Every structure is written in C-alpha cells, then in structure tokens.
Amino acid sequence: MNLAAYYPVLLFLLVGTGLGIALVSIGKLLGPNKPDVEKNAPYECGFEAFEDARMKFDVRYYLVAILFIIFDLETAFLFPWGVALRDIGWPGFIAMMIFLLEFLLGFAYIWKKGGLDWE
C-alpha cells in the first residue's frame, strides 16, 4: 500500500496544528494581561450577578441534552440514507429499518421508564 498519497493530508494537519498552537501562544505571551475582579466575574447581560455561577442544575437538563444528541444523530443518519436510497437498494433499506427499529425500541424504553416526564 502506497502511503505517499496521504503526505499532503499529513502536512496539512501538521501545519494547521502548529500554526494554531503558535498563534495562541503568541497571543498569550504578547497580549495584555491585567486581571481584575470585574473582568473575571461572569457576564449576565450587563446586570450584577444574581447568584453564584456554580449553581447546581437538575439532572433532567442533562437528560434532555443527551436525548437531543441521540435524536440529532439519528436525523444525521436519515438524510444521507434518503439521498442514497436509490443506489443502495433493498439491503440499505433493510439496514436502515433495523436501525430505526432499534432507535424506536430505545425511545419506547425511555418513555416507559419515565425519562421524558418532567415532574
């Protein structure tokens, strides 16, 4: 296997990584550094902070975020499948139906366990 065709990709990654690290380092070294209580305080739309920024969040917010990611990934798989359905034929159709069935079974399990209830 000839890996010479991948040298431009490797060069691109090395130059991009090196340039990124160099520019961030130069900015840190040469940029002004004048820490202040006001600068380090969390910004809340121009108002004084109502409470500490490190407050506890309800676990349900994280559950909603994880469920959103799952639904988003499922949609990300559906769009290319729909575009390529004519080319992939019946095996691709059956594979996606199995994927959707697994997804729907997981969704039903979450629903049955009360993961979608907001009480």
From Swiss-Prot:
Q: Which domain of life is it from?
A: Bacteria
Could you identify this protein by its name?
NADH-quinone oxidoreductase subunit A
**What Gene3D superfamilies does the database record attribute to this sequence?**
NADH:ubiquinone/plastoquinone oxidoreductase, chain 3 (1.20.58.1610)
Q: What class of enzyme is it?
A: translocase
Which Pfam families does the protein's record reference? Oxidored_q4
- Membrane-spanning residues: 7-27, 63-83, 88-108
Which residues does UniProt assign to the signal peptide? none
Query: Record keywords: Cell inner membrane included?
Result: yes
**Swiss-Prot/TrEMBL keywords:** Cell inner membrane, Cell membrane, Membrane, NAD, Quinone, Translocase, Transmembrane, Transmembrane helix, Transport, Ubiquinone
